[in-house]
């Protein structure tokens, strides 16, 4: 290895004879001394920033070096370190059985093969397997499209149709008399492991409707009746491909048919807000990519409720956009201004960050002046023209959204100059408010520019009216009958199901549009809806088996926009109190924000361009929640996945990751050793396929493997290569069980307090463990269980103890302090985990075969340490010094500066820099430790309050009263206006309910917001085995000695506590937010990262019926109810004047 933890940690061999070391202590101008073990490894050149000469110049002192050495004798400290290290090494090798395990693998070296991994061949194989899997999902969706269009073709609309169906909300509901409610018949539900253990019905689908859609509307009843034909196809698809998950049909009228059928639970207010037409998969499948400029009227006539509705309309439009769309928003009154000045003259990608940024700015819009529409229209047309000519943006649909309370003219000269006769830019008009005086001109603008006109009178009107523009944009695709297949970005559909198991699963959806094939409606381009199916990304990534990628290797996926679809370092959740919540931008994390060492973005560019190839990078890999770092050289292999917008990457680390170990043994011998009770397999790895046959789903991987090997189940499919490696490892590691058992039987009562457990893991995911204490006495019960993901083999990673040991010289141990986290485990004793790697060498190639270790109580380690430091080199008489003396402070720290042992228990587990900043600062200047800056582009920070000044004037009682009164009146106004048109919304059914989108209310701001942070990690330089120094602390000088503890990643640090060095601030390992000034922030926001556009575009069709362009809504309402809100708004300015 040229980099990695092997460079962080000491070699296990005794120190070789070194040439005479320069005695810096002989020079009174110097007060520190260092003893190099050997020349620094080349790979550490970028870490070792401070030379010995530099710290030598920094450490001038008048203190006599002889006094410092006498204060803390180097020989004594070395004796303590060697004694403690020797005792520790003997204990961990004895109880882990690491020497025996190494011998067992050594004995079979002659039968082993170590092959070099061909990364390109590997990534191509994984890609083909993923392509085949995804193709089956596409075929299932195509079957649904054909069935839905055929059913519609054979269905005649019946205005008076009466039809009962399974309503997802009402199924199994009973009234007071015990009878099933209407649309709520008995519906059998059974828990199903394949569907996250949710109660489902795999025989039939159920139908969900949002609260604001009447469940007996003739359009709904006819659509539900027609789509009953999908039930048979749902079941047939699932039988043909049992790996399918949810299949569904989202109708353009608003109902959502989902298979398998489920019970849908309203929210705490009894409201169903889920509307399939708002989902990304529906919108992407229904339309092609688009460039949109929103023009919003902010003249004085838009004050009050009109502005509130306009803001909500903009927010709703923004919610219909995705990563393939581009957007800008212009506000106009007497003059034209961009609501984000940084975006002047351009369009920006409608990713989540930009959409949310626009929403915040929209809320701050103020009204004044007179509206000048023609200037705004000219500005919008010019932006769209410039982007089209520069080959930027979506290069597909272009549209202008005009949001106003009216237009005083038709602006024909503007359209004649910029848009006629081709009408390449569609214009959609939204008339805000109940006034209809300007309706004709607003409709004329839309109808003469291939757009659509709607009138929005209330907040509750917004959703349905905004959605009309999507149906217009879908017309060319519908007329052409082009069934484009779309794949979404990664998402957690917590709105689909209120189940935690579902909401925390990252999915991608494949979807296709469903069209009306009836000849009489061909020119209208009627979209019936969208069908789709979910693919759990975990299932997709199982096709890149973990065991083929080495200890540090991994596979990842990204999209055509450069966003991560799946990556081990993608952290989509954050903790808020006791709850885990999705980060706001979890599905728009760019590849360059995870693989941030790729400064030139060469990897990102190649993958977006669908290239097949390889490149190498030196990387710093954070571990253990960012407290530690590995230095690796990674080889990246990448290719595309055909017929999808995705690209696949595979990472192999240089050194161990380049090779794969292949062993062989007989099935009979291996089977015998598989049956040992101490053996387990990686729970997330796929040894055998158990999710196809329902009879296999209850089997563990170990049970399935045994049935496969004994031929009890000929239908079982298993990974024969992986099974062979498991059998081999089972045979080689079998003697460990007898070894550990013998140790446990021979343990005395005193030795029972030494080690809690021993364990080992192999590169095939095999785990063995043995307890040396009763299970009730185990200190860390989560260790080696799924509750502690870092300690077990997962789909993404090898265990932390395995990864650390593999980068440490084989035979020496890595010690990690562990303590149970969370309030439920408060007070549990701390434990220490020690692990070592077992390496095998064949034909000069070395591979890591396994890692073994022990877990012990910290208390045992402390006892060993204090006993070791009572020894001294004096032959006769008692020792003159001990670490227990009041004039000495002794610490045992690890190679990242964390304290394992201290006199003060409160310091255990803390970073040395927090406890003694002076000494750590000196160690950094001496080069004993180096500081590495790491970056986190997925962090969450407390938002800064930049909207309001912190120095607010005192609020008078009258001002407070008026503010409260204004708020109450606003709420009353909005409430009455929404409810005043109850009858006109749903005059077809009194059972209809409304759902209101209160975007005008201030949303509760999350306490944390996405941000970029940087944080330091401190790394010991193993070339320096021992060093001493003096810190100038004003009136006194602090002496310290640091000594490497052999065969470990530990250091003994002895300091003089009598000198107060509080003038040195603590050195913290805390993350700090990276702040960007306005200019840099604007440049970052304006930058257009490389992306690949979707392959298809449907912008226009000559047969399109452009005269179907909307009409005025029926806005009749109760005059008395309308009068009060209008008066209230009129009174507000006077009341608050």
From Swiss-Prot:
Disulfide bonds join 447-1097. It is a single-pass type I membrane protein. Its main location: membrane. It comes from the Eukaryota. Glycans are attached at residues 201, 664. Keywords: Calcium, Calcium channel, Calcium transport, Disulfide bond, Glycoprotein, Ion channel, Ion transport, Membrane, Metal-binding, Signal, Transmembrane, Transmembrane helix, Transport, Voltage-gated channel. Residues 1137 are cytoplasmic. The MIDAS-like motif in the VWFA domain binds divalent metal cations and is required to promote trafficking of the alpha-1 (CACNA1) subunit to the plasma membrane by an integrin-like switch. In contrast to CACNA2D1 and CACNA2D2, it does not bind gabapentin, an antiepileptic drug. This is Voltage-dependent calcium channel subunit alpha-2/delta-4. It comes from Homo sapiens.
């Amino acid at each position: 290895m040229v980099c990695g933890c092997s460079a962080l940690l000491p070699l296990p061999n005794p120190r070789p004879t070194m040439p005479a070391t320069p005695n810096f202590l002989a020079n009174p101008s110097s007060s520190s001394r260092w003893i190099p073990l050997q020349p620094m490894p080349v790979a550490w050149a970028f870490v070792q920033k401070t030379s010995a000469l530099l710290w030598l110049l920094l450490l001038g002192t008048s203190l006599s070096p002889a006094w410092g050495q006498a204060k803390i004798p180097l020989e004594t400290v070395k004796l303590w370190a060697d004694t403690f290290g020797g005792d520790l090494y003997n204990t961990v090798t004895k109880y882990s059985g690491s020497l025996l395990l190494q011998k067992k693998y050594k004995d079979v070296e002659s039968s082993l093969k170590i092959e070099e991994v061909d990364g390109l061949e590997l990534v191509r194989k994984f890609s083909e397997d993923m392509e085949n899997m995804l193709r089956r999902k596409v075929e299932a969706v195509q079957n649904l499209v054909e069935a839905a269009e055929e059913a519609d073709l054979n269905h005649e609309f019946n205005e008076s149709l009466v039809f009962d169906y399974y309503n997802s909300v009402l199924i199994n509901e009973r009234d007071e008399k015990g009878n099933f409610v209407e649309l709520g018949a008995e519906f059998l539900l059974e828990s199903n492991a394949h569907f996250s253990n949710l109660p489902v019905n795999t025989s039939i689908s159920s139908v969900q409707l949002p609260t604001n859609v009447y469940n007996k509307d003739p359009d709904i009843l006819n659509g539900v009746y027609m789509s009953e034909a999908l039930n048979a196809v749902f079941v047939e698809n699932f039988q043909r491909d049992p790996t399918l998950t949810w299949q569904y049909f989202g109708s353009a009228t608003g109902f959502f048919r989902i298979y398998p059928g489920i019970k849908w639970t309203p929210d705490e207010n009894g409201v169903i807000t889920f509307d399939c037409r708002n989902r990304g998969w529906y919108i992407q499948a229904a339309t092609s990519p688009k460039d949109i400029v929103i023009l919003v009227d902010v003249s004085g006539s838009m004050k009050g409720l009109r502005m509130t509705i306009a803001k909500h309309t903009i927010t709703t439009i923004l919610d219909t956009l995705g990563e393939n769309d581009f957007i800008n928003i212009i506000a106009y009154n007497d003059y034209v201004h961009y609501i984000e000045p940084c975006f002047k003259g351009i369009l920006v990608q409608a990713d989540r960050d930009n959409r949310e940024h626009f929403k915040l700015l929209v809320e701050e819009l103020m009204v004044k002046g007179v509206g000048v529409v023609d200037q705004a229209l000219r500005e919008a047309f010019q932006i769209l023209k410039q982007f089209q000519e520069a080959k930027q943006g979506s290069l597909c649909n272009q549209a202008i959204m005009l949001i106003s309370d009216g237009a005083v003219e038709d602006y024909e000269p503007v359209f004649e100059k910029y848009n006629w006769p081709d009408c390449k830019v569609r214009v959609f008009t939204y008339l805000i408010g109940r006034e209809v005086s300007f309706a004709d001109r607003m409709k004329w603008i839309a109808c003469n520019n291939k757009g659509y006109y709607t009138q929005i009178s209330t907040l509750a009107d917004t959703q349905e009216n905004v959605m009309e523009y999507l149906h217009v944009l879908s017309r060319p695709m519908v007329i052409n009958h082009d069934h484009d297949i779309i794949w979404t970005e990664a998402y957690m559909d917590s709105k689909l199901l209120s189940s935690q198991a579902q909401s925390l699963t990252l999915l991608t959806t494949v979807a296709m549009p469903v069209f009306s094939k009836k000849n009489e409606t061909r020119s209208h381009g009627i979209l019936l809806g969208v069908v789709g199916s979910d693919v759990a990304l975990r299932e997709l990534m199982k096709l890149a088996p973990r065991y083929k990628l080495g200890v540090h290797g991994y596979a990842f996926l990204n999209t055509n926009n450069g966003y991560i679809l799946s990556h081990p370092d993608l952290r989509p959740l954050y903790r808020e109190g006791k709850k885990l919540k999705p980060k706001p931008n979890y599905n728009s994390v760019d590849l360059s924000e995870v693989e941030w060492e790729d400064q030139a973005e060469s990897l990102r560019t190649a993958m977006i361009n669908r290239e097949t190839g390889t490149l190498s990078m030196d990387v710093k890999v954070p571990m253990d929640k960012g407290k530690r770092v590995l230095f690796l050289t990674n080889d990246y292999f990448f290719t595309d996945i055909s017929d999808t917008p995705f690209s696949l990457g595979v990472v192999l680390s240089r050194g161990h990751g380049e090779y794969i170990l292949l062993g062989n043994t007989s099935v009979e011998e291996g089977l015998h050793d598989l049956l040992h009770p101490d053996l387990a397999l990686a729970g997330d790895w796929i040894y055998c396929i158990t999710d196809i046959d329902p009879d296999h789903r209850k089997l563990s991987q170990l049970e399935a493997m045994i049935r496969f090997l004994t031929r009890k189940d000929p239908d079982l499919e298993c990974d024969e290569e992986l099974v062979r490696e498991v059998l081999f490892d089972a045979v080689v590691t079998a003697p460990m069980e007898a070894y550990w058992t013998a140790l446990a039987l021979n343990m005395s009562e005193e030795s029972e307090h030494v080690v809690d457990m021993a364990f080992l893991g192999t590169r095939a995911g095999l785990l063995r463990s043995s307890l040396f204490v009763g299970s009730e006495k185990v200190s860390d019960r989560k260790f080696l269980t799924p509750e502690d993901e870092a300690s077990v083999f997962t789909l993404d990673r090898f265990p932390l103890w395995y990864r650390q040991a593999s980068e440490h010289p084989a035979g020496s141990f890595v010690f990690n302090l562990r303590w149970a986290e969370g309030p439920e485990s408060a007070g549990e004793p701390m434990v220490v985990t020690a692990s070592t790697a077992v390496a095998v060498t064949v034909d000069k190639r070395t591979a890591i075969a396994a890692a073994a270790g022990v877990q012990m109580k910290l208390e045992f380690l402390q006892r060993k340490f204090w006993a070791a430091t009572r020894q001294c080199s004096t032959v006769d008489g008692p020792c003159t010094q001990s670490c227990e003396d009041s004039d000495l402070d002794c610490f045992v720290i690890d190679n990242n500066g964390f304290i394992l042992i201290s006199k003060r228990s409160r310091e255990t587990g803390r970073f040395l820099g927090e406890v003694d900043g002076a000494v750590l600062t000196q160690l950094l200047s001496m080069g004993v430790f180096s500081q590495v800056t790491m970056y986190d582009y997925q962090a969450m920070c407390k938002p800064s309050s930049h909207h309001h000044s912190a120095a607010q004037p005192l609020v008078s009682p009258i001002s407070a009263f008026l503010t409260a009164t204004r708020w109450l009146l606003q709420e009353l106004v909005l409430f009455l206006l929404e409810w005043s048109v109850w009858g006109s919304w749903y005059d077809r059914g009194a059972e209809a309910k409304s759902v209101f989108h209160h975007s005008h209310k201030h949303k509760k701001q999350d306490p944390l917001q996405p941000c970029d942070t940087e944080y330091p990690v401190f790394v010991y330089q193993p070339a320096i085995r021992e060093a001493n120094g003096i810190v100038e602390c004003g009136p006194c000088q602090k002496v310290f000695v640091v000594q490497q503890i052999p065969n470990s990643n530990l250091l003994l640090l002895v300091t003089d506590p009598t000198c107060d060095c509080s003038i040195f601030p603590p050195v913290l390992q805390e993350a700090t937010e990276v702040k960007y000034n306005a200019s840099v922030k604007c440049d970052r926001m304006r930058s257009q990262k490389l992306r690949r556009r979707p392959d298809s575009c449907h912008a226009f069709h000559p047969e399109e019926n452009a005269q179907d362009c909307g009409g005025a809504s029926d806005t009749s309402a109760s005059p008395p109810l309308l009068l009060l809100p209008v008066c209230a708004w009129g009174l507000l300015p006077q009341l608050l004047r």
